[in-house]
Amino acid sequence: MMQPIKKIAILTGGGDCPGLNAVIRAVTRTAILKYGYEVIGYKFGYRGLYNNDFVKLDLDSVSGILHRGGTILHSSNKDNLFDYQVEDENGKIVKKDVSDVGVENLKKEGVDALVVIGGDGTLTSARDFSRKGVNVIGVPKTIDNDLLATDVTFGFNTATEIATEALDRLHTTAESHHRIMLLEVMGRNAGWIALESGIAGSADVILLPEIPYDINKIVEKVKEREEAGKQFTIIVVAEGAKPKDGEVVVSKIVDDSPDPIRLGGIANKLAIDLEGLIKNHEIRSTVLGHIQRGGNTSTYDRILSTKYGVKAVELINSNLFGNMVALKGNKVSYESLENVIGHTKNVDPEGELVNTAKSIGISFAD
């Protein structure tokens, strides 16, 4: 028979994302007000679990954070306790499985269940801790919206709204100066932000990781617009977009990261390439970057994050561990962590949204 739950912990891992604080708030308030649990939060993700570095969470500590971006618990995207950098007896940095330290720290603090908020990498470790007997509940987080097991991840709506507003602003300057403007948005393997903001922000060309582009098709679109009396063109490009028979643009390699290859720079490269093909327009590129992650959280994401946080605690109370909360249609449900890891949700090149965009004249340069 399961022991009654008295104390739970929360940690946030991976890149920051609008809605993290809303989840922390919802978990804490539900745990205290509905079930009478004690709540702590580990700082800087799994690093805090390894170092047993935590703070007590109560109603006061989560007051006023619903709208705020980032995470009051801080985060790290470099700390995998199953492959963690430590110093050996010779002072050499080596990678080692130190997950047992995390398990022991949970036991030492009397933590009965752990809520892990993160993307694929963070949730992979959550699954692995579940396999070691830890009572884990996952909450999916990524602005890329690329987790297959849930219809929507929190943070995506906010990021898309920010990208859409950026496109709105670029329109006025592009039209004033007859420029071709490129906006680079996040989207390593999945182009959801570029696709949805491109439709909502009235882009002329959308470039996605899922649809390799032909630069000559972009030139054709610019000429088509010129012939229609439009002397400017707006292009939104996901950071993972690449030309046909080409490669993605890598900005840097982070050796101590579980995900060392960092993309970025495709908009600037494409602007340079286009300058050699289009002579009568200025071409400018803008990288939206981490602006997509920061600032206040949208209304939709505040509500979705709150629903996720409440559901996470309800799963704990029902002893339904080893699961991740997920949105299915309009209902928050759950899915086994064993089934969600490594399964990404990519844009379907033949899907409804791509068809919608093409039907209103948007080019994918394919």
From Swiss-Prot:
Q: Which NCBIfam families has this protein been placed in? A: PFK_mixed, PRK03202.1
Q: Which HAMAP family match?
A: Phosphofructokinase_III
Main localization of the protein described in the UniProt heading: cytoplasm
Single GO cellular component annotation? 6-phosphofructokinase complex
Name of this chain's protein: ATP-dependent 6-phosphofructokinase 2
Pathway where this protein functions: Carbohydrate degradation; glycolysis; D-glyceraldehyde 3-phosphate and glycerone phosphate from D-glucose: step 3/4
Instruction: Report the Gene3D superfamilies cross-referenced here.
Output: 3.40.50.450, Phosphofructokinase domain (3.40.50.460)
Tell me which residues bind ATP: G15, K78, D79, G119, D120, G121, T122
Q: Which family does it belong to?
A: Belongs to the phosphofructokinase type A (PFKA) family. Mixed-substrate PFK group III subfamily.
Q: Is Ubl conjugation one of the keywords UniProt gives this record?
A: no
Location relative to the cell: Cytoplasm
Report the cofactors: Mg(2+)
Any GO BP:
fructose 6-phosphate metabolic process
Q: What is the recorded function of this protein according to its Swiss-Prot or TrEMBL entry?
A: Catalyzes the phosphorylation of D-fructose 6-phosphate to fructose 1,6-bisphosphate by ATP, the first committing step of glycolysis.
Q: Which GO terms describe its molecular function?
A: 6-phosphofructokinase activity; AMP binding; ATP binding; diphosphate-fructose-6-phosphate 1-phosphotransferase activity; fructose-6-phosphate binding; identical protein binding; metal ion binding; monosaccharide binding
Binding of substrate occurs at T142, I143, D144, R179, M186, G187, R188, E239, R284, H290, I291, Q292, R293
Important for substrate specificity (site feature) positions: G121
Q: What is its EC number?
A: 2.7.1.11
Does the record's keyword annotation contain Transmembrane helix? no
List, from the UniProt record, the residues annotated as the active site of this protein: D144
The protein's matches in Pfam families, at most eight in alphabetical order, are given as: PFK
**Quaternary structure annotation from Swiss-Prot or TrEMBL:** Homodimer or homotetramer.
Q: Where does Mg(2+) bind?
A: D120
The chemistry this enzyme catalyses reads: beta-D-fructose 6-phosphate + ATP = beta-D-fructose 1,6-bisphosphate + ADP + H(+)
What keywords is this UniProt entry annotated with?
A: ATP-binding, Cytoplasm, Glycolysis, Kinase, Magnesium, Metal-binding, Nucleotide-binding, Transferase
